[in-house]
Amino acid sequence: MANSLYQKHIISIAELSRAELELIVKTAGQLKAQPNPELIKHKVVASCFFEPSTRTRLSFETAIQRIGGSVIGFDNGGNTSLAKKGETLADSVRVISSYVDAFVMRHPQEGAARLASEFSNGVPVINAGDGSNQHPSQTLLDLYSIFETQGRLDNLDVAFVGDLKYGRTVHSLAQALAKFDNNRFYFVAPEALAMPDYICEELDEAGVKYQVFSDMESVIPELDILYMTRVQKERFDESEYAHIKSAYILTAAHLSDARSNLKVLHPLPRVDEITTDVDKTPHAYYFEQVENGVYAREALLALVLNESL
């Protein structure tokens, strides 16, 4: 029996079922424990990044090679002949998809991954980020990291801190965790960077409990997961940014009353929002989280390219 992810476009977390998310998390754990360099042997995967990326691109390309695949592609689409000659994205996708078995793509334009899926001639498209819209593989590694540290994906207390308005990682993770039972969310952000209304409306419809806070200190003792994000300086004037930034900097002292199982996650890169003394605490998990990106992406690629896995 074919798994439901076989040959499926991975465009948005919202389009993945709870069962599919659980399958990816389970497979990631299996591949971390027991590597399999034959899973996509003789498969060729395009890694096409139309805007610069470090972690996501290297993580995907590592994952492809560790499970036996080959990689073609580029890491700065603006410098390719495709862009310089004025070729449309649709035509570029048509051409590249004729060479490969799967198509991993990052693009600055929202909706670009969806467009690519319409012109890929049936080749599965994996969205590696389209503007501020979606970044599903980041959410998959977040889910795997949560499961690895907590042993479950339900009945969790999770705080999202920082830029909740523009941060695509927090939108997708909230949507994913809403598919599981009895999760409780704490949204900690300045009013100008609050979680978007559409996410809150989705949570209301799903019956997910959430609370809104302006500071994080009072919620830390209640948490299993503390998901930090960067407050973006460019969205504020200097005086406002200085005030907001200081309210959302996590130090080791903040964790003195934390639950023993609390883990701090961050999509990286961090700037000032987590001080380096947190790195030495048992709560820090953001570098392990980055490593888990390889296993989550191995699992995703293996399931998309193997009918019976």
UniProtKB/Swiss-Prot annotation:
GO terms for biological process: 'de novo' pyrimidine nucleobase biosynthetic process; 'de novo' UMP biosynthetic process; glutamine metabolic process. Carbamoyl phosphate binds at residues 55-56, 106, 135, 138, 268-269. Keywords: Pyrimidine biosynthesis, Transferase. Its EC number is 2.1.3.2. Signal peptide: none annotated. L-aspartate binds at residues 85, 168, 230. One of its GO terms (cellular component) is cytoplasm. GO terms for molecular function: amino acid binding; aspartate carbamoyltransferase activity. Pathway: Pyrimidine metabolism; UMP biosynthesis via de novo pathway; (S)-dihydroorotate from bicarbonate: step 2/3. Coiled coil: none annotated. It catalyses: carbamoyl phosphate + L-aspartate = N-carbamoyl-L-aspartate + phosphate + H(+). It comes from the Bacteria. The keyword Transferase applies. It is an enzyme of class 2 (transferase). Belongs to the aspartate/ornithine carbamoyltransferase superfamily. ATCase family. Heterododecamer (2C3:3R2) of six catalytic PyrB chains organized as two trimers (C3), and six regulatory PyrI chains organized as three dimers (R2). Catalyzes the condensation of carbamoyl phosphate and aspartate to form carbamoyl aspartate and inorganic phosphate, the committed step in the de novo pyrimidine nucleotide biosynthesis pathway. This is Aspartate carbamoyltransferase catalytic subunit.
